[in-house]
Amino acid sequence: MRNAASVGLCVGLSALGAAANDILKPEADYRDFRHYQLNNGMHAIAVHHPRSNESGFAVAANTGSLYDPQDVPGLAHFLEHMLFLGTSKYPEPESYDSFLTESGGANNAYTDEEKTVFFNKVTDSSFEEALDRFSFKSPLFSRQYEEKEVNAIDAEHQKNIPNDDERAWYSIRSLAKGPMSRFATGNSSTLSTTPKAKGIDLVDRLKDFHTQYYCGSNMVAVTISPRSLDEQEALIREKFEGVSAGHADWLGMVQCPGPMFDTVKPFDESNTGKFIHLQSFSSEPSLWVAFGLPPTLTSYKKQPISVLTYLLEYTGQGSLAKRLRLLGLADGLSPVVDKNTVSTLLGIKVDLTQKGAAHRGLVLQEIFSYINFLRDHGVGHDLVSTLAQQSRIDFHTTQPSSSIMEEAAGLAHNLLTYEPYHAIAGDSLLIDADPRLTNQLLQQMSPSKAIIAFSDPQFTSKVEDFDTDPYYGVQFKVLDLPQHHAIAMAVLTATPNAFRMPPPLMHIPKASDLKILPGLFGLSAPELISDQGGNAGTAVWWQGQGAFALPRIAVQLTGNITKEKADLLSRTQGSVALAALAEYLQEETWISKTAG
């Protein structure tokens, strides 16, 4: 925003008219949920939200940019823009937006690799009409709005061009085999200039795409409303049963095809072990190390990628992040992940200092030394079990979202991706604390299987014979990682005592049956519970549990200086002292933040 075959839509389907709460929900969530299926194969979730005066709803299709035809990049995104510019029942192109304005509503949509999600909210009194207008039946795809929406998409893309992170990640993906390498957003060239030059009728292609993928068994719907579950289900059945179930095949069986993109393995020895040197539009250099790993979506109960990203972004004693900071090579480090049904692309982005940019070979040595260290020591069950415990606490203390339409969008996306029972939890809940899959993935993270990208502000003064990307305009050069470098880094051992395995999480509740204590809410004013007085000047106040029943404590430290010391120099010294204290406490505060 991803094979004549795809991951099956909605594994473990429930019967029609299922009972409420046939979906795992947080203990802190007071609402009722229901998963059900329409006669046309469409799956749906209804959420009874008794405390809301709005209704939110979302519809998602199991298709996205990886399904784009090779000769029209951006077609899935273009369909997202064109779908609600008039239907046979409501032909005026602006009628849906006008209706939302009049009913105090809002809407949005997005297209990612394998999903297209449309989401809305309205006042509850307008809920039924909103669903009728939104029911995906007989869109007109009016040609008179083709140019306008192409221009809107082109404007979106133009805003992305200066983003160094987006351009670096795109340069890495562009080396993949199959549709992962393609330009996903679309622009005026791919959606107008080139199709016209080739005699391609864009609207006809749009209609074919819609007919192929927007059918009942390839779609889901979610409603969140103060109305009862039965009433919501009845409305969805009334408004969406008319969506086509699919197409009759030669045996007369109704079919709604899944993804039709190439199932080729995106990354292998032919396109890894590469170094991409690319132009940066920023003054800040960055280094990226990415690995094309096997798909992990179906392993969501074990969360191997979440465990890996925790290991990589850990900033405590003996961490990669701390090591790079101590050496003056980097200011920060963050993992980046793309997951789809054919691959998991895991990246490590390092924000380099000027020293790091000049010595990026040393940065790579430290990165692969750390990965080798993790692989040699192995991820233990103790750490993963505490990550699982923390994920359970986070999940079961989750309150209903303040954005009813964003929550509907998330549920719709999850219903297309995970078992219906886990549509709320998605990939946020580590259910099976088994580190074996994580350790297997670490075995594949070697230099010869990596793609390394260096985003360089001084690119043009250093590189000759470069290429220019046609979509982002970025100048770049792709080189093979020298074999002797790859072999050397694959067997690097860390400097003694440089790295330590992250310990099990601290500061998390051990009990799994936490209860809300009575009488902790509604304090009229904070209560003083400790006052050291004197020169120490330390006081501790209790302000109650707050608005949310969460098993955590918040500590705020406030320092004051006397009036006679409030001059510019003293304030500057105070700011420097606080910054130094924050740096000194970074490890401990990171560990605490990890625990919620």
From Swiss-Prot:
UniProt EC number: 3.4.24.-
Task: Name the active site residues.
Answer: 80
- Tell me its cofactors: Zn(2+)
InterPro entries with a match to the protein in the record: Metalloenz_LuxS/M16, Pept_M16_N, Pept_M16_Zn_BS, Peptidase_M16, Peptidase_M16_C, Peptidase_M16_M
Note the SUPFAM superfamilies from the entry: LuxS/MPP-like metallohydrolase
Residues the record lists as binding Zn(2+): 77, 81, 156
Q: Which GO terms describe its molecular function?
A: metal ion binding; metalloendopeptidase activity
List the Pfam families hit by this protein, alphabetically: Peptidase_M16, Peptidase_M16_C, Peptidase_M16_M
Give the cofactor binding note: Binds 1 zinc ion per subunit.
**UniProt KW keywords:** Hydrolase, Metal-binding, Metalloprotease, Protease, Zinc
- Output one GO BP term: proteolysis
Q: So what does this one do?
A: May be involved in the degradation of a protein which is a component of the signal transduction pathway regulating oocyst sporulation.
Which family does the record claim for this protein? Belongs to the peptidase M16 family.
Mind telling me what this protein is named?
Sporozoite developmental protein
